[in-house]
Amino acid sequence: MHGPTSKAISRNVRSVKRPRRAPRPVVSTQAMNKLSNVTLSAEQEKLRERVLSFMRSNLSQYKSDWKHPAMFVIQGDAGTGKSVILNSLFNEIQKLSQFSPSSEDILHGTHNYLVVNHPEMLKLYIRISDSFKYISKSSLERPTSLINNLQKRKVMADVVIVDEAHLLATSKDAFKRFYGENHLKDLMSLCKVLVLVYDDKQALRMGSYWDEGSNNGATLKDFYNEIPPKSRDWYTLKQQFRVAAPQNVLNWIDQISVAGKIPPIESVLSKGNADCADDKIKNFDFKIWDDCGAMYEAIKEKDRQYGQCRMLSTYDFPYRLDGKDYYVECGDNFKVRWDRYTPREVTPWSERCDTIDEVGSVYTIQGFDLNYAGVILGRSIGYDAANDCIKLRPELYDDRAGFTKKKNIHNAEDVKQKIIMNSINVLLTRGVRGLYVYAYDPELRERLLRPSKK
């Protein structure tokens, strides 16, 4: 039997009056709740008000012949609540820009943007905007898009807030349609007030390399010092909100991922925090494993119990964006595929049920929390027996794009080492309830588990 002709179908479609589609409900995720439904601490609330006061003061004094915007930097290690403050701050200034108790408020009628150079984080902010009536999706941008947009329209923003400013490009990237020399430099020419959240220990690529301790890439303080003292401010957050671990575990993470030293195993397995009043800290689950397959089984069990427990690895196993599956292999009993590239996926990788069958990279998990993180220290991370410390082997690190040399990288080998250390730091600071660690290198694995000599 033949169906109706295409013309008949066309007429039928036009003749039917379709009902208006109902708004899509906002499905809340843990990542959304942790960023938007959080009561600020006393320090965070005080900082938010300090930034608001800074904005008002500098907007009211702004003159068109100024060469630089006012700049407020919020620095802090991973997990210190930087993005939580930004989300609250941006919601407040957007509310004041549209509906202010006083039309004389300098923020009334302002045009403001929140920028993040991280696709997963941008998707999260866009989803959160559905729950905040004052935040429009058009005010949330990747830096290149905003720069190109403002330059094309020849307009200036009032306030630009940058989350994860350590991911801003520090060199030209024609592939991503950025033709300037530095994202921050261009943003500084396109706004009156700039607020940056920053942690140079999370810079992961030579093309967006920020380092306050060398002449490689870019240094935020160089830009900051160009601004007159009255138009700049810098605040450092120190309280850890994500990793609810005792201080000895936090020290272990810092020693491994920043100093490259190997603390005694007893220092993290001791019960020195038994008297801690905070049960979350007292019960933080830390373990170094000698069997990656067994660690994975434990992570799956924790995922059934708590959810959001995942395997992670340094970028030490091959991966290409060619549509094929690539695998992380450790020993005889662990072969799990890398996370698949899914740009259309709305739910964060850490919260999708299917990703328990994957290993996440530093790019997948940066900016997000897990309840338990099972971290594989891959092939590029070995052991220097002579000096009893971490030994890095950059030639085994497989992030080719991350190691693409730029003209402002003067000591490429030093930068490669720092990028690997930064990636370790990002991975080790994801777990809220627990951290499991496995070292691919057998000598390092044995050393991490070895008791100190008495």
From Swiss-Prot:
Entry's localization field? Cytoplasm; Nucleus
**Stretches with biased composition (Basic residues):** 14-23
Q: Which domain of life is it from?
A: Eukaryota
Sorted alphabetically, the keyword list is: Cytoplasm, Nucleus
Report the principal subcellular site.
Answer: cytoplasm
Q: Quote the record's miscellaneous comment.
A: Present with 1130 molecules/cell in log phase SD medium.
From the Swiss-Prot or TrEMBL record, give the protein name: Uncharacterized protein YPL245W
